[in-house]
Amino acid sequence: MPDTARPSATTEPTPFMAQYLSIKAEHPGALLFFRMGDFYELFFQDAVEAASILDITLTSRGEHDGKPIPMAGVPYHAAEGYLARLIKGGCRVAVCEQMETPAEAKKRGSKSIVQRGVVRIVTPGTLTEDALLPARQGQALAAIAFSGAGEAALAVCDVSTGAFDLTAIPAARLGEALLAWPLSELVISADDADRPLILEARGFLSAPITERPGRAATAKSGEALLKEVFGLAALDSLGDFSRVEFAAAGLLLDYVKLTQAGAPIRLRAPRRPDTGGILLIDPATRASLEIDRSISGGRDGTLLAVIDRTVTAPGARLLAARLARPSRSVSEITSRYDAVSHLLGDAGQLEDVRVRLKSAPDLERAVMRLNLGRGGPRDMAALSKAVLSGAEAAGVLGRGLPPRLAEVAETLGLSGAPSVRAFAEDLARALTEAPPMLARDGGFIAQGWDVALDEVRALRDGSRRVIAELQAKYADQTGINALKVKFNNVLGYFIEVPAAKADPMLRAPLSADFIHRQTMAGAVRFSTHELADLAGRIGRAEDEAKAREIAIFEAFCAKVEELTGPLAVIAAALAELDVAASHAVWAAETGAVRPALDPRPVFEAKGLRHPVVEAALRKEGKGFTANDLHLDAEGNEGARFLLVTGPNMAGKSTYLRQSALAVILAQAGAFVPAASLRLGLSDRVFSRVGASDDLARGRSTFMVEMVETAAILNQATPESFVILDEVGRGTATWDGLAIAWAAAEHLHDTNRCRAIFATHYHELTDLAARMPAASNASLKAREWKQDLIFLHEVQPGPADRSYGVQVAKLAGLPRAAVARAGQILKKLEAGPSASENLPLFAMVAEDPAPEFSPESSAVIEALAAADPDSLTPREALDLVYRLKDLSRGA
């Protein structure tokens, strides 16, 4: 965003504009929402930019330096919607509020202006409001710090829930670490902006990157901020964090502190996630497998979208997190399977649980908004409803549960948290059925909850009844049946009569009682001492009622802060139950099965299916062809390297992807769409399937392909699972074949991992004969009356041909081009046979290079010694004769 700080000034600004310019100068990188009464106003370039993004009217207010000041504004009560559009447009917004009323300002002097101050800076990674946040997606704000030893630290928080993770990682794995989180914004030190790893991250991250001064990213500043935020004298209680981790924490907390503008930071103490206990997925693999983000950038068509059956927002976020960071812990995965199996075994119980969960609002975000002072009565009602719905779900679960579900049921049943149950029940009684969003609107405390409030309301409501009686009295007194008692914010309560009937009230004797206030085109307005006195009593009663409700609400907020810990545990249990139920529902719908975990690095699947492709085909009323796969990295029960050949469109890429997705699903704790699956856990999944240019970094399609292949060959271990499709296709045939051959050998001989390698280089199929742990498979295709039919079935052995010309015909190439391609193919296939000394390469040997005679060498030497620029015409002619003699051997 361009810097929109204070413009140059040659004239003295007004006090109001001086106040604006002073505040704006403190926030040059953000649009300034400047509160003026019922509007947030923007000025100068801020107004121009906001008007363009929001499609609102751009006007002007006064002059500065002899020029009109551009101005645009939005109503404060509808500000959240406008903020959401600005944030989506890549803006940061500083929200500047009035810190006092105009009446309070006047007490300081008749010319005093209202004091204002920035209360918050709204950025993509620091959102908390419902209207600004996608309910079913997480929102991670991350910060990175680097050490000089090839190590980096990643601090990640979610301001909307309070989660805070802090971990050190090898700097080379930064991409994997960043994409394992639903990143909304990344904070870096300005000193690190030109690091190659940061430049690379700019290429694959969709989240904005914010730079902060280098002094914010030091271990010393991190330690100081951690002590300040968590009220600690020493950091020992937080755990054994390194200096680079403290630096990352400091950078993150510094930014959160900046955006909250002095408000308390409400994060939980940092925890170190077990990065060694998760399945690592690099950026290229995550993109090609479309786990939670499609190639087009949306959610549709992703693995997450297809399997998601959650009914709560926290459950949806937890499911996404587990797909992004699958586990490597056998005990953790098994406990997740046990929960799914139990729910899957009782359809009635499963449905009853989901009915209760559907009525549970977003507890963790409601609690955080209340703790941040941004919540309202609706958040309080959401808290109560979520806690009580969870208790009902626990009651449905009953007894005889596997350990993980038993723990969830105990937490949700509130047997260990009686104070939480009591508070939730109190809220259910205290709040009206449909409370307003904001506490200042009032009317959210139910009748009968608070005696003092009921008394004030009785006075207020009784006075309103008196107003109705006064209207009848005044109509009778004046003889004007059209007389009405009305209210507005300027006049308060007043009497209004049609202008045509107002004359008697303007003359004695009625004028003695009715005081003229305002004459309008069609009406005249009056007041009376009696009405003014009653209006004062109503206003005071209204103010007292709102003040009492605010006091009750603040007491509730204090209780929420006291119970934040147990409420966070309950929110996590609700999400856990929702995810288990989601997996059970999806398994019931699709016939997905529980994987059998094996301590050995095997992958043995029967009837494996691609969940996303199958779902798409099902919508079209078509079936999916399931296939088997058997890999063993130790080579005891079969090949660890499978080389797959077959025509384009036959299903090779689908076969590869469904295998990798099965690993991710299984290690996330979900069941897998197959007849059966026996699986040894993987440490990493690699996918090199499909590629495109990366023009921003000057990389061609082939360069991208080679970078991704290099990453796999350099990083895959015997516990990894690798899929590669068409390695080498982006360059010349023989270069590509050589690269594919070398890559296949390296995977088999050096990496020794489970790998599926799809190729059109049929010469590579002979590798299975010389690599002991390799085997061939192919996709079936049949020709029928000159048409090609894909059977999508995987069979043992290599394919005999690629059917490229037939696929070109299916793609719609002109008939003449297809016919010509067929003719050329026949000639090529009838060419010379393979060279004996390169048995895997069907290449034609080149003719031997001609040898030079001594005479030729002498001619060349003479030419090399000549300087054409220095020769005279006579010397040049002599050289020609000499060369002729040399060529004859003279």
Curated annotation (Swiss-Prot):
Pfam families, A to Z: MutS_I, MutS_II, MutS_III, MutS_IV, MutS_V
Annotated binding of ATP, by residue? 646-653
Coiled-coil spans are none
Keyword hit for Ribonucleoprotein:
no
**Could you give a single Gene Ontology term from the biological process aspect?**
mismatch repair
One GO MF term on file is: damaged DNA binding
InterPro entries associated with the record: DNA_mismatch_repair_MutS, DNA_mismatch_repair_MutS-lik_N, DNA_mismatch_repair_MutS/MSH, DNA_mismatch_repair_MutS_C, DNA_mismatch_repair_MutS_clamp, DNA_mismatch_repair_MutS_core, DNA_mismatch_repair_MutS_N, DNA_mismatch_repair_MutS_sf
Q: Which SMART domains does the UniProt entry name for this protein?
A: MUTSac (SM00534), MUTSd (SM00533)
The entry's keywords: ATP-binding, DNA damage, DNA repair, DNA-binding, Nucleotide-binding
Q: Does the keyword Cell membrane apply?
A: no
Per the record, its GO cellular-component terms are:
cytosol
UniProt function note: This protein is involved in the repair of mismatches in DNA. It is possible that it carries out the mismatch recognition step. This protein has a weak ATPase activity.
Family indicated by similarity:
Belongs to the DNA mismatch repair MutS family.
- Its recorded name reads DNA mismatch repair protein MutS
Recorded source organism is Hyphomonas neptunium (strain ATCC 15444)
- Lineage, uppermost ranks: Bacteria, Pseudomonadati, Pseudomonadota, Alphaproteobacteria, Hyphomonadales
Q: Which gene encodes it?
A: mutS
